A protein has these predicted regions:
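ATP-binding Walker
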Residues: 20
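Extreme N-terminal, non-catalytic leader segments
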Residues: 1-10
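N-terminal phosphate/diphosphate-binding loop that engages ATP/GTP or pyrophosphate donors
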Residues: 23-108, 113-131
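P-loop (Walker A) phosphate-binding loop of NTP-binding proteins
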Residues: 17
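Hydrophobic anchor at the beta1->P-loop junction of P-loop NTPases
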Residues: 14
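Residue-level detector of conserved catalytic or cofactor/ligand-binding positions
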Residues: 132-138
């Protein structure tokens, strides 16, 4: 994200443990902002909610919640696809940038402060070992 490009729009972050009511609160916040003529969309920053079929164990937002407010990064990956902090950072930053460019307030919702911090701060994360090509000595 380009720093200070969208200084007039806030980025709201809701972080807390699984099943603590974050999704419901985020929907209420977005609906209230809409009433006040400030459109808002929810961006998932939870490392497990990105996976399809993990609804119960991750307290994935209900279909009703997802129909009430636009949600990004919910149930987008098959459970066989590895995810990482770097992938989530990239996908979520793209979603935040998209929202801000349309004048929409992004509401980040997740269980890990690390993931949310990686998205909103200037945090540089090295790739995982599985993504690094290691040369054999000759």
């Amino acid at each position: 994200m380009r720093k200070n490009e969208y200084v007039n729009l806030p980025v709201i972050c809701l972080v807390g443990p699984t099943a603590s009511g974050k999704s419901g609160l985020a929907v209420r916040v977005c609906r209230r902002l809409y009433v006040d003529e400030h459109p808002a969309e929810i961006i998932n920053t939870d490392s497990m909610v990105v996976y399809r079929g993990m609804d119960i164990g991750t307290a994935t937002p209900t279909l009703r919640e997802q129909r009430t407010v636009v949600h990004h990064l919910v149930s987008i990956l098959d459970v066989t696809v590895p995810s990482s902090l770097v992938l989530m950072q990239t996908l979520a930053r793209d979603a935040v940038e998209d929202c801000l460019s349309r004048g929409v307030i992004p509401v980040l919702v997740g269980g890990s402060a690390l993931y949310t911090k990686a998205i909103i701060d200037e945090m540089s994360i090295p790739p995982t070992l599985s993504l690094i090509h290691i040369s054999e000595p000759t």
